[in-house]
């Protein structure tokens, strides 16, 4: 989002299901990285020179591994001067990015607009989001 905004490209982000934690005031500062089934978790994150070898899933189920993976990620973000998620979302919104919450996810989770961090503009349906971004390049990660 930040690179696109810096190049004059409109940025619109639609948060759904697990992404809702990123915009939820109560959860955004306690986000965790689950190592089980996470293809982004590489052994190099633990300081082991193993190339592209992933952390085995069996290790992810061990007690404390989620906390360990989360600490690794937070330490790496701090080392690279990447802002925390709450601050980054505010930077995006301040720079003109449009942030939206998925209505179906909001309804399923019993959330309301006041549950979200500053910068979230509205709760919209997926169809509304597609109408708003018609003709745009959409990236789903």
Task: Give the residues covered by each predicted segment.
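A charged, amphipathic interaction segment
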Residues: 59-123, 127
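A structural signal for short, well-ordered beta-strand segments and their strand-loop junctions
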Residues: 12-15, 100-102, 140
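Flexible, low-complexity linker and terminal segments
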Residues: 122, 127-141
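A glycine-rich helix N-cap at a beta->alpha junction
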Residues: 31-68, 73, 81
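Long, hydrophobic N-terminal alpha-helical segment
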Residues: 1-29
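Short coil/turn connectors at secondary-structure junctions
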Residues: 7-11, 94-97, 133-136
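Short, hinge-like loop/turn segments at secondary-structure boundaries
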Residues: 29-33, 118-120
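Short C-terminal domain-edge/linker segments immediately following a structured domain
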Residues: 14-19, 43-47, 130-136
């Amino acid at each position: 989002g930040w690179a696109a905004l810096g190049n004059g490209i409109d940025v619109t982000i639609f948060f759904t299901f697990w992404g809702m934690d990123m915009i939820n005031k109560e959860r955004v500062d306690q986000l965790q990285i689950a190592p089980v089934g996470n293809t982004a978790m590489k052994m190099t994150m633990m300081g082991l020179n193993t190339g592209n070898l992933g952390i085995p899933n069996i290790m992810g189920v061990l007690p404390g591994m989620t906390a360990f993976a989360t600490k690794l990620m937070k330490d790496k973000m701090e080392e690279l001067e990447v802002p925390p998620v709450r601050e980054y979302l505010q930077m995006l919104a301040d720079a003109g990015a449009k942030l939206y919450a998925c209505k179906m996810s909001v309804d399923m989770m019993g959330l309301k607009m006041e549950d979200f961090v500053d910068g979230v503009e509205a709760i919209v349906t997926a169809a509304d989001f597609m109408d708003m971004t018609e003709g745009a390049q959409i990236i789903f990660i």
